[in-house]
Amino acid sequence: HLDSNITRAEFAQLVVNMMNHKAVAATMESAGYFSDVADSPYKGAINLLYKEEIVSGTGNGTFDPNRNVRYQEACKMLVKALGYHVIVSDTSLDSYTFLAGTIGVTDNVDSSKEYITVKDMLVMVDNCLDIGRMVPMYYNDNIAPSYIIDEEDTFRSLFEKSTPDGTIKMEGIVTADASTYLYSKRESL
């Protein structure tokens, strides 16, 4: 199970979960950005990430939701979700993959495989939960923002703050963390 691959659609949903945007994704289910996601249970997540320019299609108006996600695609999605795309001048997959390694997204992940596994995804998402997000800051009515790394409001802290008591209720799991919770909920979405 941990060694199985994960699809592009499933990974999109997990990125939305990590960003704590499930409610927003639910409002995006009827958006028609891609012709091949209408029947996908993850269509809201895919559409939201497309609108936010975190994912792109595969050409001809398609997303290919059932294809396994490649390691470099996962790196690009996570780097963009963290906001670091603003410092990437070369938008090749290699550049995003390099940046993902630099900021810690790929720590403890085998980068030699073309496709990521469930285990790789869990490690990458868990890494992202603790990486400071790149956020825009506006100074003196300047229209163009400056960007800073916000070490205080990581996805983990934002996720934990979103629950009433700051805890995450787990069902059927003895020991787990936020990334395990995010993954365990993918089938129920």
Task: Enumerate the predicted regions with their spans.
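Surface-exposed binding/hinge segments that line
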Residues: 119, 124
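Feature responds to low-complexity, polar/acidic, surface-exposed segments characteristic
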Residues: 1-12, 16-43, 52-115, 129-188
